[in-house]
Curated annotation (Swiss-Prot):
PROSITE patterns: PROTEIN_KINASE_ATP, PROTEIN_KINASE_DOM, PROTEIN_KINASE_TYR, SEMA. Proteolytic processing yields the two subunits. Residues 1349-1360 have a biased composition (Low complexity). This is Macrophage-stimulating protein receptor. It comes from Mus musculus (Mouse). Expressed in liver, skin, lung, brain, testis and kidney.
Amino acid sequence: MGLPLPLLQSSLLLMLLLRLSAASTNLNWQCPRIPYAASRDFSVKYVVPSFSAGGRVQATAAYEDSTNSAVFVATRNHLHVLGPDLQFIENLTTGPIGNPGCQTCASCGPGPHGPPKDTDTLVLVMEPGLPALVSCGSTLQGRCFLHELEPRGKALHLAAPACLFSANNNKPEACTDCVASPLGTRVTVVEQGHASYFYVASSLDPELAASFSPRSVSIRRLKSDTSGFQPGFPSLSVLPKYLASYLIKYVYSFHSGDFVYFLTVQPISVTSPPSALHTRLVRLNAVEPEIGDYRELVLDCHFAPKRRRRGAPEGTQPYPVLQAAHSAPVDAKLAVELSISEGQEVLFGVFVTVKDGGSGMGPNSVVCAFPIYHLNILIEEGVEYCCHSSNSSSLLSRGLDFFQTPSFCPNPPGGEASGPSSRCHYFPLMVHASFTRVDLFNGLLGSVKVTALHVTRLGNVTVAHMGTVDGRVLQVEIARSLNYLLYVSNFSLGSSGQPVHRDVSRLGNDLLFASGDQVFKVPIQGPGCRHFLTCWRCLRAQRFMGCGWCGDRCDRQKECPGSWQQDHCPPEISEFYPHSGPLRGTTRLTLCGSNFYLRPDDVVPEGTHQITVGQSPCRLLPKDSSSPRPGSLKEFIQELECELEPLVTQAVGTTNISLVITNMPAGKHFRVEGISVQEGFSFVEPVLTSIKPDFGPRAGGTYLTLEGQSLSVGTSRAVLVNGTQCRLEQVNEEQILCVTPPGAGTARVPLHLQIGGAEVPGSWTFHYKEDPIVLDISPKCGYSGSHIMIHGQHLTSAWHFTLSFHDGQSTVESRCAGQFVEQQQRRCRLPEYVVRNPQGWATGNLSVWGDGAAGFTLPGFRFLPPPSPLRAGLVELKPEEHSVKVEYVGLGAVADCVTVNMTVGGEVCQHELRGDVVICPLPPSLQLGKDGVPLQVCVDGGCHILSQVVRSSPGRASQRILLIALLVLILLVAVLAVALIFNSRRRKKQLGAHSLSPTTLSDINDTASGAPNHEESSESRDGTSVPLLRTESIRLQDLDRMLLAEVKDVLIPHEQVVIHTDQVIGKGHFGVVYHGEYTDGAQNQTHCAIKSLSRITEVQEVEAFLREGLLMRGLHHPNILALIGIMLPPEGLPRVLLPYMRHGDLLHFIRSPQRNPTVKDLVSFGLQVACGMEYLAEQKFVHRDLAARNCMLDESFTVKVADFGLARGVLDKEYYSVRQHRHARLPVKWMALESLQTYRFTTKSDVWSFGVLLWELLTRGAPPYPHIDPFDLSHFLAQGRRLPQPEYCPDSLYHVMLRCWEADPAARPTFRALVLEVKQVVASLLGDHYVQLTAAYVNVGPRAVDDGSVPPEQVQPSPQHCRSTSKPRPLSEPPLPT
């Protein structure tokens, strides 16, 4: 039924409006964006002053006054004094105790000091009053030493140490001068008047608290005679009952205003597990050193992808553990964002989720800011809430139960006197509100693990200096309003890559970072400018960095040998489009690059930009503001557009593009000025040579192909048919494809091609003819590729007809093109269509139309599967038989749709169809010779010779009987020879004369080796030896020289290989696999499996074997069997060395009755296979023979995909030979439907085989399609039939199998998708569901007995993303009784 012409024209017009033509694709070209990361290079190496301390740095301190400065570095048993440039001054020995050379030990008197022990420095702080350096170590009960600073010459030195310890005031149960704890101690020194107060916090445990223990928190006053600390100091300590379970880690301490603060990481409560941690802030009064002012507050730091300024929004990720911290004043801009005044101090902290800083989904580290002003307000409000009687609740706890007796607000801790001094404010308190902040950098630190932090204010910006776990320093501007990091620098401190120490010291305008055994001095303004690669990025750097443009690089002025400036940048052209244009026409040229203008919204002033291409000027076009490109935070680009106009003097050829910018107004950072030249633009002359077809229907829709040279030059082109544009579909250098518009009538009209507005020379016409009219289609059924006949009028007017079949869900199309002479009928082929309907056919609408003319639709068209012939070989007819019977699968169903002809010996026979059986009566005149005659069947014009027909005779039967008798006799002789050889070899072994020549491979003995017997032939099931065929010697010089050169990289000398010929791992059709050892050049011995060939005698087959071995050379994956090497003996055949797989192949493993895997075990095996196949697919490698028998299991139960065609054993029931390929044997029951039909293999055919492998696993090795003959399998699958769901198979996994078995390869999943789907199945399996081994599935040889002798082993997790998270269970362990 045809479509009305007005409706058709409306549809064409709508398509024309909606569809983007090729003419506009040039205009839509966009400049490739440049990543911002390309403007900097963080791999640039900077050399900063450093000092190697000879041991891991434990602490650093710095001192500076108006005249002198020094750096102090503590390591185990040593305290180094350095100058301001880290030059060595002197060294003080601090241990081991008991060593006569210990200088600090000697200052405490002769001792005794206990057994010799190394001293680790735990505290290193400056006492500002004297000035002096105070150090506290891990020995001598954690006592401290005072080192006064003495100027000597131009450097500072340490005076003799003073021991801050008085024996009379210190006892095991109460030690006044015990300060440092081996578990960690933090000290802040506050000077009040002429006294120095030490605010000390130490971590404690039961062992440390038993004798000479410091206190958890204490405020100590230094004695004026520097003999120790005043006794009776205020302190708090963890109660004895919580010492073992409640460990407080003190991370950082600082003095700000009237208070001293400590930051701790500790358990959430005394009842929570030790792993449930959070961070707290401790505040003590620095004006009145009283412990009653002790306050604690919880600090919460979160990461939220979409930051919310207040609170901890739902769905954010908490980061409870503090890693490092520092307090500093901030600049005005950041102060506004933090709701504080400029210059106020802010506490910055680096937080992580777990100990190692890994956070799983979010970044590894986050940075939060806590204004000190807001912290104090929150603490004061908490105190008032507890102590004000009208607000306090009887249920509000005072907290700090690990320090004091539990009590409720406003009461003091239990047992305290209720006098004037017992007021609520004068006792330690835990503020129950928490202070919550979100990540300042909004997750932009990503995978960076920050270990150190120091914050400085530099002019109008605040910079965070961060050390990382891999020994790098990041200097980043802090700004909450940005969604990207403003780097000052990002560089490596050295080659060691060790974590940066948490504590950072400042000396003038430099910071001291410690990493490993080194200390580095890093300028706060950054180590340099060379990591900025572009001029614009260089001049946009913060002014405190002092960066400027030095010719072609960014540098500081003192480091620039030539011209250095900070005021302008030249333009840079990185790309342009198009690369060629017509000599006669105009071209719209787009320039891409940077420094064309200062801001994207800038209007280019007139006269500032001059563009020339060769000799031709290019007129600058105004920016198109109607369709601005979306901006990106990670990339940028600037564009200029100009129109290149033709110039008479311009010549054909390649020339340069020049951009000159002058007199541009200056911007905030710099101005744009200079010249940029880019070569590579070509002027060409387009040529049109042919147009086809030159006719079409009046309705239009004809696809015209214009051929010539240089047809894609420039940016605009148009094909005009009688003045109307032909819609462009495709444009390339040599062709233009367009669709003709409707014509006014039947006539020959002019056709022109315009490029760049100029007409291409030539005289061309197009002939509009009468529209074709389709009246009918016959026959009413068919199959993919079969012929149908189109009937109608004016059918030669259309260049091509489109056939479309729609089954209600999907549509397939094909084109029938060419010039035909028949006006009233046209023969075309049906499109490719796969019948998936279980009933064996599909019904739908078959439509046909010619070019843009009205179409015709035939409803109820029946699509059938294509018939497939079965080759019968030789057909013998008895003397009394006069007809031939052959089977042609599916022919009966399509017999009414196509023509069928049958010939015997070239003579036509009047055949008869009975279903799929074709009966051909022999013509009386036909003579059957002794060689027979061919039987040929032609279906729809395609002919196949199915067999040779011969006449049976008595002589032929006698010959058959004689042949059978001869074969039986040969078999008996062979059996006798086997027995004689076996007895002879056993006798020689008993006599101790065991020797084997390389040329006597036919005498190999198959004794049990304890290793799995890999693939056994039917002749060796009883364990007796099987003689191998004697092979002719193949010399190395017989092989291809290029192949030998390629193999040389993996060649292994035969002297380094020992082959245990009495330990046969497996035997197959092509050879034997032995157990052996390989000794490499370092004398490391490796157990391996050695594959040899025995049935290959041709040089070409040996070369093919070597090429398949080379395929494994570049494959490296935990689930792929690796190649150790290839050995070429002086004589004989090559051998391949592979890793020894203890548990043999996967098929024998799952079939073994001694194994008892769960469903989860079996599916996990499948997951590992999918991981290996995902890797093979990424390497563009097609396996072609994926099955359980070709997967191996090593000692850790890791599955390895193997057998890529190397000397593979052949199982007769699982392989069959293809006649066209003499040596090819195919695993038909694992092959995809399209591979069975075309013998072509792809990654999607491997996906089909993977589905069969999953089915094997869940049935524990059952043979697929056990009742289907291999030759009938293709027809079986084409009907939509598949393997049934195994008994223990989850529905979700069977759904995965069915997706692997889709008839359409494009509908099957990729191996990457399969890995994710099978992982979900594994994750959903709970409990132990054992797959029982059905008796029908058991088909194992003697090696199954070997499996039973293997002791139970744990299944270890497999590598990478194939690892199982469940608890391993021995696969050899029987299930528990239920």
